Regions:
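Strand-loop-strand
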Residues: 95, 99-116
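Outer-membrane beta-barrel "beta-signal"
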Residues: 110-116, 121, 139-151
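C-terminal outer-membrane beta-barrel translocator/porin domains of Gram-negative envelope proteins
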Residues: 1-81, 86-89, 93-95, 133-136, ...
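Conserved active-site loop/cleft motifs that coordinate metal ions or position small ligands
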Residues: 81-86, 120-126
Length: 151
């Protein structure tokens, strides 16, 4: 089965300027968005405004684009075990800019899905095709585990 998810969202830029340390805003990274990137690691940082790009406090973006493509297939149908191959692409920005696909974060990977008695379990490995802007997120790939659904 092939699943595609596409999201684009924005937050009122003038309202966002009033919140210096806001918990809201758009962050990407982690098993439910850009797999392969650390959770909430993709987005503007305070260092981006002081010349230390990719360093500092996570600020969250005002604009966000995310696309996920998955192909799932049965591995052990009687047990409810499935395999998944995926590709994710997205980014967040502090101000509206033309979207350049060559600058978007891109990941791919594989995983296992099991419909257990506890609910859907996911074990996925994501690999960064593009480099991270976050100086603290130096891993090229990461394993992640989740209980619950994605699509």
């Amino acid at each position: 089965m092939v699943d595609v998810k596409a999201l684009a969202d924005f937050e009122d830029d003038d309202a966002a300027k009033e919140d210096i340390y806001r918990l809201e805003g758009f962050y990407l990274g982690g098993i439910n968005s850009l797999r392969g990137y650390a959770p909430r690691s993709v987005g503007p940082k305070s260092g981006d405004f002081t010349g230390q790009e990719g360093a500092g406090i996570d600020l969250g973006g005002n604009f966000m684009v995310l696309t996920n493509l998955e192909v799932t297939f049965p591995l052990v149908q009687e047990a409810g075990l499935k395999g998944v191959v995926f590709m994710d692409m997205g980014d967040t920005w502090s101000r509206l800019e033309p979207v350049k696909f060559r600058d978007m974060k891109l990941t791919s990977g594989v995983g296992l899905r099991w419909l257990s008695p506890l609910g859907p379990l996911r074990l996925e490995w994501g690999y960064k095709i593009t480099e991270s802007d976050d100086v603290s997120d130096t891993d090229k790939s990461r394993f992640e585990f989740s209980i619950g659904t994605f699509f």
